[in-house]
Amino acid sequence: MHGYLPAVGFALRGEGASIVNTLESRLHVVWYAIIHGANQRDTIAPEFVLTAFIFMTEPLARYQARIETALSCVLPPAGERLADAMRYATLGGGKRLRAALLYATADDFGVPPDSVDAAACAVEAIHAYSLIHDDLPAMDDDDLRRGRPSTHRAFDEATAILAGDALNTLAFALLANSPLPPATRLAQIQTLADAAGWAGMIGGQMGDMAATGKTLTLPQLQAIHRGKTGALIRAALHLGALPATDYAAHAATLDELGEHLGIAYQIADDILDATANSATLGKTAGKDAAQGKNTYPALLGLDESRAIFAEHSARAQAAAARLPHGAPHICALLACIIHRSH
């Protein structure tokens, strides 16, 4: 391990900080109106709308900067082929939404960010490893990831497989060596292992592959994505809140939030795959349809997919509102996730 993680601090400065502090409770109304195109936004003062926009977008950039710095510190130094492949796959762009959700949850639960840096890096390491393996010829066979060649194309298949394996094990080493109390570390390890394993992300990927070329029902499709996509999103929320003293009282609500957010995120991903181009997505567009994958647009059409997306987005927002202080940091990220373009 190359030291631990540096203390990296970010904050709103000047008038922006005081505006957000005084208007935080009102921003929920503002961003909800913006998201849903509600008529009431016409009656909201322009400075509130501007503040809401800043409030929605600034946290994501702040969390992205923090996780990039942290990841660069915990990955092995460049210079050897395996280390280079690990860094290529992990540091090569990406939205960092899982790490951002983890940090946002920690913020809303009053958990210092430096105490969850290890967990944020662990989630991103697991996500990067899953993308490496998903892109392999034996699985999704995709040559493009995050706007550049997939890891197995930039290096070779054997190196890509080993880089994914190394990132998988690194994730749990980070959690085991974090500065949190042993009981919390153990709970985080168990949470991530369950999310990434046979009953979570890996099981969902297996179900997705097994269902290729078949027609599924909506519950069957959602069951696959509950593991493939949703498990790691739910884990990120729990990992950020686990160090908090009031975690247990809100665990069920975090599950509910993660459930609906995971489904909404996957529907958005499917819609983008069907409607956006490769340059926008940073990966091969239209690949799901070409491979006979089960997607929401393929099963339901775009209009019905968008309707179900809106339903789960609203239910995610409602769950977040029941978290401590209305979870303003999580809510701000939900707005970014709901309106993502890639």
Predicted regions and their residues:
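Short, Lys/Arg-enriched N-terminal segments with co-localized hydrophobic residues
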Residues: 41-55
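N-terminal polybasic/positive-inside topogenic patches
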Residues: 11-16, 22, 45-49
